[in-house]
Amino acid sequence: MGITVLKNEGLDFHAKISTPLSEIDDDMQKELLDLTKKVKIAGFRAGKVPVSIVKKKYGTSIRNDIIERRINHWVNHVIKEHNLNIIGRPKIEELQNEPDKALEFTVKIEILPKITIPDLKKISLDRPKLEVKPKDVEEQLEKLATLTKSYTKESKVTIKDGDQVTIDAIGYIKDKTFDGGKLNDLKVVIGSNTLIPGFEKQLIGSKTGSEIDVNVTFPENYHAKDLAGKDARFVVQIKAVHTSEPTLIDDEFAKKFQSNNLEELRTHFAKQIENESEEAINTIMKMNLFDKLEKLLDFDVPESLLEQEKNILKSETDKDESLLKDKSSKEITEYYNKLALRRVRIGLLLAEYAKSKNLQLEPDDFKKVIIQQARNFPGQENMIFDFYKNNPKAIEALKGTALEDKVVQYIFNNEIKLKEKKYTKEELEKYLEEEEQRITLI
């Protein structure tokens, strides 16, 4: 057996390996002899089948198995001998596997870079902190009171803000109907902003039995991309109009929502308002940390990981073409290259950090990720939980996200300096919106 190192620089290791024909033949002869003792072939007694017959029938498959084992053996030998920290599967090229010649092949191996973890204690970040004001809580109470109103009194006068209207509607774009444009017995409270912007306002002043045209424009960020930004006309039938009595917000109101009194419900809402902002804050904090890390990392990364990440990026941007619609092909290529490099470097660093701190994933880490995903599907949470409960492989696919979240949280708690920065609800909403726009392409 001979090993010739062809390349050992950067993250690439290439070697040419050869095994004498005599070794292959020896293995072949041994396995053929073993098989003659076990194989059953018509016309021969058990254990008395000639080697030549066994070779004719099974020789090719036996030789292929031997070659595969030999290749695996010598590749593993090279990896151990040169102490290679490999990534992915070694590539076998230039395979010479002729029956009358020595086995020869070239193995190409990608190596993980040596990663030096930077001094994370030198990193400092602002941590947004929401200051919940009494007016924020009162707004939530008012919304709850509005949502739980009982609309029992039918109105015979014209529609006004706050009325509940039952409608049928058919939507048209350029005088043609479209999928999802038909509404039947839809109940909507005027002013709730449940429908497309401008829709509800145009119903004001109409009466039960009226038929009116409502002209709207679908928002640019509308979830149905084929409708986003388009003008539409809805022919609306007003089927019924109902009003409600004002809801008194007091202790009795609070008891309807598992609170002993109004003050307890206020406390609950204050905590809920604070918690609702935490997930968005954590996402932005993570991206801000990654911004800092990106400037500290300059190691080379394996080409295979880079290409894999570029493909993921392409699939992400293909789902939302608006992300790169104003960029040239050169700018798009540069974007993919830069962002893929950032993601791979940070991913490798976090994995190395987890190893250095012996951070292990536990069931609760996966549970947190699943809960986060379920929040993206309001009303379908149980379906998401059931999906992961019944699909262990799907849970395994969350491993990368779960580890990233765990490591980032550990770094926040034990490494970097966090300076609390207080925001009002309005200030925080503006900050989060601006930051979310910035990190959309990260």
Curated annotation (Swiss-Prot):
Signal peptide: none annotated. It is found in: Cytoplasm. This is Trigger factor. Its EC number is 5.2.1.8. One of its GO terms (molecular function) is ribosome binding. It comes from Rickettsia canadensis (strain McKiel). Consists of 3 domains; the N-terminus binds the ribosome, the middle domain has PPIase activity, while the C-terminus has intrinsic chaperone activity on its own. Keywords: Cell cycle, Cell division, Chaperone, Cytoplasm, Isomerase, Rotamase. Its main location: cytoplasm. PANTHER family: TRIGGER FACTOR CHAPERONE AND PEPTIDYL-PROLYL CIS/TRANS ISOMERASE, TRIGGER FACTOR-LIKE PROTEIN TIG, CHLOROPLASTIC. It catalyses: [protein]-peptidylproline (omega=180) = [protein]-peptidylproline (omega=0). PROSITE patterns: FKBP_PPIASE. GO terms for cellular component: cytoplasm. The keyword Cell cycle applies. NCBIfam families: tig.
